A protein has these predicted regions:
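Metallocofactor- and cofactor-centric catalytic cores in central/energy metabolism, strongly enriched
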Residues: 1-400, 407-410, 415-486
């Protein structure tokens, strides 16, 4: 590599030893940021994680602080790629671990047993919330884990792709195994017509999913809604947890508010878990396609076959075309918080981001709104936006989401959203946000030891222990939109 990452703040003039070289720091350098190991001429590629993260904007000296002011991305437009398959043997034994989940009629397993109200259109959000309040007051949630309405602004005034995205995500929520029962709540006149929407659910369990079209109710829609919810509650409260194999777990992999520690602590930790889960017969999903730019060839060459490689090429280039069609550069992703935390370019971010999926082969590629069909590691088309991407992961069928963060974030999607801190300061400062601390990895804890604790924590959450977002009541959905609003 061309750089090293500072594990603590360094002052100008301090001396460090790297691979037998004595390096004097030329500037004050914050923790998580990069220092140059050797002189680099203007235009020279700067390597981190063994790959280029950009090139020097000017001549750089040994010991110089490398950041967005002197490092420029190499990313531009779409590319042509060649399939050069790489196979890694994980050598991880199947431990036959189990968790206690809710087994549904179709064989899927939930980690929660909740009652959900799903509006087909934003016009009925208020009614949905009122119904949830009434059912909570009446039942005290006895015998179930929670009652929620999933507000959104869509379902009408949308065309083509946006309209289908909304319908697919709402369908996926209705069919999610974490829901013991669902009330689909419609206005009646929306573009997302209720009868057509219900057909999208396929052969669904009519005792567990019911429809209320409020414009067709003569009189009080709340009274009619409560009648249906009481029927749904009577079904859901009888569900009990059963011992099932961890192979039934489907886990989403996400990062947000990343910093310079993300790629050396939390993301590799999540990657180790992902490999372990895949070895147990389980499933993990990586998304945030724009945050794969610069690391995409690593994923492409891990595809199990040429067909999956071709799908991954489309996954990447289609998102690049989306950026370019709006006149936006493909490499301007890092946020102000990313840069303040030590991430300078999109390649820098991507090479850290993709470590969340470990080394397992890619066994499936999903479009936005698709539901999981293949066990193992899957890639999913969705943007990097935290709320949109996390919702997409859960919609694909993930029962929980692992979310690494260096800056911190409180939000959660409609499934448990576990926050893993990249550094111990965040873990200490925001215990109400953070579920697990990966910062121990730069404080002497061995990866193999922390992975065992991490596996136990995830299984505890799958068994019913609340993630911090659940405890705080921070749960919401966000649907991808890229077209015209009428």
């Amino acid at each position: 590599d061309s750089v090293v990452v500072c594990l603590r703040p360094f002052k100008q003039g301090e001396i460090i030893e790297v691979d037998g070289k004595t390096i004097t720091l030329l500037q004050d350098t914050p923790a998580g940021h990069k220092v140059l190991i050797d002189n680099a001429a203007e235009g020279t590629n700067i390597l981190k994680y063994g790959y280029p993260i950009g090139h020097a904007k000017k001549d750089l000296k040994q010991g110089e602080w490398v950041n967005e002011n002197n490092l420029k991305t190499n990313l531009a437009g779409t590319l042509e790629y060649t399939y050069n398959p790489v196979e890694e043997i994980l050598n991880i034994e199947n431990e036959n671990r189990t968790f206690k989940g809710y087994v549904r009629k179709n064989g899927e397993v939930g980690v929660r047993n909740e009652i959900w109200v799903v509006p087909t259109v934003g016009c009925v959000n208020g009614i949905a919330e009122k119904l949830v309040d009434l059912l909570k007051q009446e039942t005290k949630c006895e015998g179930i884990d929670a009652i929620h309405a999933w507000h959104h602004n869509f379902g009408c005034s949308q065309l083509s792709g946006d309209h289908e995205n909304t319908r697919k995500v709402l369908r996926d929520i209705c069919l999610h195994p974490n829901a013991g029962a669902v009330l689909v709540l419609s206005l009646g006149c929306e573009n997302n017509q209720p009868d057509e929407f219900m057909k999208m659910l396929g052969d669904y369990d009519k005792d567990r999913i019911k429809l209320l079209v409020t414009q067709k109710v003569e009189g009080d829609e709340l009274e009619e809604g409560m009648k249906l919810l009481r029927e749904l509650y009577a079904q859901a409260k009888e569900d009990k947890r059963q011992e099932v194999s961890v192979s039934k777990l489907r886990v989403g992999l996400k990062c947000g508010g990343s910093d310079g520690f993300s790629g050396i602590t939390a993301n590799p930790l999540v990657g180790e878990f992902s490999d372990w889960l895949v070895a147990q017969g389980g499933t993990s999903i990586l998304t945030e396609v724009p945050e794969m730019f610069g690391a995409e060839t690593i994923l492409m060459n891990r595809c199990e076959n040429k067909e999956l490689f071709d799908k991954t090429v489309h996954l990447i280039n289609d998102f690049k075309e989306y950026f370019l069609s709006h006149g936006e550069p493909v490499g301007e992703n890092p946020s102000p918080g990313n840069k303040a935390g030590g991430i300078s370019t999109l390649e820098d971010k991507a090479l850290g981001c993709t470590q969340k999926c470990g080394r397992a082969p890619v066994s499936g590629v999903l479009q936005y709104g698709d539901r999981l069909e293949t066990t193992g590691l899957n890639l999913l088309s969705a943007p990097g936006n935290d709320l949109v991407a996390s919702t997409a992961l859960a919609s694909a069928g993930c029962q929980l989401v692992l979310f690494t963060t260096g800056r911190g974030t409180p939000f959660g999607t409609f499934v448990p959203t576990m926050k893993i801190s990249t550094n111990s300061n965040l873990y200490r400062n925001k215990p109400n946000w953070i579920d697990f601390n990966a910062g121990e990895l730069v404080e002497g804890t061995e990866m193999k030891d922390l992975v065992r604790k991490f596996i136990d924590k995830i299984i505890a959450v799958a068994n019913g222990e609340e993630a911090r977002n659940e405890y705080n009541g921070y749960r919401e959905i966000s649907i991808f939109k890229n077209g015209v609003t009428l």
